[in-house]
């Protein structure tokens, strides 16, 4: 007998066929899953549980058993039996039945699958449309099993055919997985219509709509044939353009013929002529009447219609082949149909039905109804406006929440407080015009000049002093309130800045070292002098009235201004002031000095007390508690001249004071060098402390103004190169110190070494106490223990960098004299690195 040869249909015996034979795979499809696995991140190597649906003959299970980790669970299912495979569980079942689900759950217990594979296909051969739909149904059933058994973030790989259900399946995949891609591996034949879809990142929804996996819902046809209607319209109104394009429509389901006909009378009576003209090939005329047949209505109607003028021989020839007609011929057929329907009365019947059902006329509205309707419209508009405002408010609130979450804490309320106050307090001409006082109001001093006639009529000008005082009080109160609001806003700004900036918090904690200590209150005659100046100005001004000048003098005679009185009244120190205690303190300070000076001070204080008692006794009746001042350094030196203990105490005080000083700035280091080298002494430092910024008046000034002035009211002190180098070296020493984590790690390492040493000591003691061993054996065992203690970790070999120049240029192998790992570098790589940095810097901007 001759040798039987295998058929080479569709190139089945290609190189993958022979490779599968060599590798021992059961089918050439093994290389499909291998190529998919390599393309999509080696997901099989990370899978502990794998399910292979429609696994026969088991080639994909073979690949999974080789690539998956050891002791992985691999389950293969198919409707046909599968020969046993090592490390693979196989059973025979239909994946569309409940039996398959229960058996899968029995094998998996409480586990979830990391990967589900599906390479199944139905028995093909019935028809392409039917085969593709069956494959889509099978894929949906496999997806249903995968959804039940996949873990969150799992992978699903399936085979599908490109058909009209492909997009529906892809939409379902995208609802359940984060990443969905279609691919065709090289091992798949080009003539095959199969493609593979890889779905990664299973979302694992808690609730799943059952319609998402129902074939009736997923593969439901949408549109209702609108596309065919549009195509038919194109065939009728633009047949030349439509006929020039290739139509890849195929056959309709259940209709596998290309030639369609219809009786002419049915075409006339139907309501969709365009669709019929586009889909039919021919209209059949009524057959001649036989003697055996009864009278037919269609024959009678056609006899009437055949006598029309539009029923020409050309028309009868055109209806025999509709596919070759143009726009002119189709219009002729439609005109004939319209005339035929008019003669047969088909359109008249429809008009009569419309006449039987007359249209309902709307009666005009009355005046009251119109008013009610307008009111209702206004109410509806108001509701819509309120709804819109509410929506805008919600949007603003949402934006504010987002701004707070992103730490965009810019104060948007700056100026609102001032606007609320100023809107009522500012002068407005409109309000003055409404009250009729606009003509009486004047601007500046010119309108305050009185004419001689007016003075003759009114010899005495009566001005209510209480009204003037009230106006002054109101304006002063407003100014005080504005100042308080500015102070509050500045404090809020400081609090916000302290929350954001740690350096600012530290600066606030340290305080301002430049601020001088408060040494009490000295009497000042600034207010009196200002009152005198004001008096001189009022006398020199000829335009002012004498009565107004007298009132101004009376107001200026007060000892303190309003702000000063508020300051002294708010401070508890001045409320508790006692003159007797002050006198005692002055006596103690001036003891041993000239007695006349003491007596003069006492007399002066007594006179001041008498004057103040006549004025305001209630404000100064409280007590004042004074803490005695510390003794000066000179007094301490005088008193402790003969005592050694005091000398020791002073030296300890000076040493502690020196320890607190930290030379952290270049200016401080420069000053320390100058003092140490004798370039400056104590008196030079005192002279430098007196400058144009030393005695600047800061009383009654707001904090925000003082803080802003401090930034600029500073002397720039000279520095030296040696001081800068010293500070730099100091910073280097600080930076050289390891961080806290490194110190903790080193201490933990030492602690572990000490623990190991303690263990070795205990073991060595036990070895020494063992009398059954010789001294040599004891020494050997103890030396072995010490070797374990001193054992160091292996260091990784360093990579040697070899420059490709000279003899190494163009070298393909290992350079001479280089051992271990090495890396070849050249000038091109350096230029490339520079270019990459330059590009990154460019796009960073």
UniProtKB/Swiss-Prot annotation:
EC number, UniProt record: 2.1.1.-
Gene Ontology annotations of biological process type: maturation of 5.8S rRNA from tricistronic rRNA transcript (SSU-rRNA, 5.8S rRNA, LSU-rRNA); maturation of LSU-rRNA from tricistronic rRNA transcript (SSU-rRNA, 5.8S rRNA, LSU-rRNA); rRNA methylation
Recorded coiled-coil stretches: 366-402, 464-502, 739-796
Class of the enzyme per the UniProt entry, highest EC level: transferase
Residues that coordinate or bind S-adenosyl-L-methionine: 58, 60, 78, 94, 119
Family the UniProt entry places it in: Belongs to the class I-like SAM-binding methyltransferase superfamily. RNA methyltransferase RlmE family. SPB1 subfamily.
Function statement: Required for proper assembly of pre-ribosomal particles during the biogenesis of the 60S ribosomal subunit.
UniProt-annotated catalytic positions: 159
Protein name, entry field: AdoMet-dependent rRNA methyltransferase SPB1
Name of the gene this protein is made from: SPB1
Bias (Acidic residues): 513-528, 536-545, 610-624, 633-648
Reactions mediated catalytically: a ribonucleotide in rRNA + S-adenosyl-L-methionine = a 2'-O-methylribonucleotide in rRNA + S-adenosyl-L-homocysteine + H(+)
